[in-house]
Amino acid sequence: MRVLGIETSCDETGIAIYDDEKGLLANQLYSQVKLHADYGGVVPELASRDHVRKTVPLIQAALKESGLTAKDIDAVAYTAGPGLVGALLVGATIGRSLAFAWDVPAIPVHHMEGHLLAPMLEENPPEFPFVALLVSGGHTQLISVTGIGEYELLGESIDDAAGEAFDKTAKLLGLDYPGGPMLSKLASQGVEKRFVFPRPMTDRPGLDFSFSGLKTFAANTIRNNENDDQTRADIARAFEDAVVDTLMIKCKRALDQTGFTRLVMAGGVSANRTLRTRLEEMMQKRRGEVFYARPEFCTDNGAMIAYAGMVRVKGGATADLSVSVRPRWPLAELPAA
């Protein structure tokens, strides 16, 4: 079975074709980073218009890359949410239309389930059960995963997501968009413990997160210190260390609570090298395992949507011809497969 995946939830247009026997056959991606850079963040209307321009040409490119034609596609999977409503509608409309024209199923995919399953694309995929840490610009969640669609929310951010806090703090430091990767690069030049930031909500029980106060702390630290390059790097280092420590402490608690020995990290922030290193060290001490996707599959991409669509089709998922998206869509509402 071959599934075409379409990802248009935010500022990346991702198209991929996944074969259940041969694996990934094609992967096309167009990033809108340059389009939004002058605005310091994603402009929804511009994102939607660019998806309209890029989606069909990328589908054609994916078919060419794989050496396939429309007749070889058995299902079309598209991101139906969560995300920007206009951007989602572009992918949903094109996905439904192609599925109708090709007489194949159209499968709506949950964007965060796509991220959660992205490590399954690697040579050493995780086995169930595991704790999933989903960290991106819009989400910071800890999930107990016992099977496809068997998701229990253990904790989440009550305000800013980790990725959002990275981007906002990067902006305070005068860094270009996208800020998260730029802040991490700057932090690598910083001196450890020159500044010490709080570890939010780690002094109390529970698995929820809060990062808005950390952003405010960073703003005050920036305002009260010199604006030289080394000071900015030291502040970036302190901020990154605080976020990574907080995520690690909560992961420990989630693993203790569930008794699981496997940790899956997914979402854009999971590409952060410091976070990967610290979680690897933690899981080695616990004699457990940590799994994550290669960096290009941590950020938004069509491969994870094609794979998630494949899993759902095999689980018996069906859909009618209506075009519907859900900008807000709790992961726990997904059915088991």
Curated annotation (Swiss-Prot):
Transferase recorded as keyword: yes
Classification via Pfam families: TsaD
Reactions accelerated catalytically: L-threonylcarbamoyladenylate + adenosine(37) in tRNA = N(6)-L-threonylcarbamoyladenosine(37) in tRNA + AMP + H(+)
Entry binding sites for substrate: L134, V135, S136, G137, G138, D167, G180, N272
Localization annotation: Cytoplasm
Cofactor note: Binds 1 Fe(2+) ion per subunit.
Protein name from the UniProt record: tRNA N6-adenosine threonylcarbamoyltransferase
Main function: Required for the formation of a threonylcarbamoyl group on adenosine at position 37 (t(6)A37) in tRNAs that read codons beginning with adenine. Is involved in the transfer of the threonylcarbamoyl moiety of threonylcarbamoyl-AMP (TC-AMP) to the N6 group of A37, together with TsaE and TsaB. TsaD likely plays a direct catalytic role in this reaction.
InterPro entries assigned to the protein according to its UniProt record, in alphabetical order: ATPase_NBD, Gcp-like_dom, KAE1/TsaD, Peptidase_M22_CS, TsaD
Gene that encodes the chain: tsaD
Main location: cytoplasm
Annotated Gene Ontology cellular component terms: cytoplasm
Keyword Transmembrane helix: no
Cofactor: Fe(2+)
Family as reported in the entry's similarity comment: Belongs to the KAE1 / TsaD family.
EC number(s) given by UniProt: 2.3.1.234
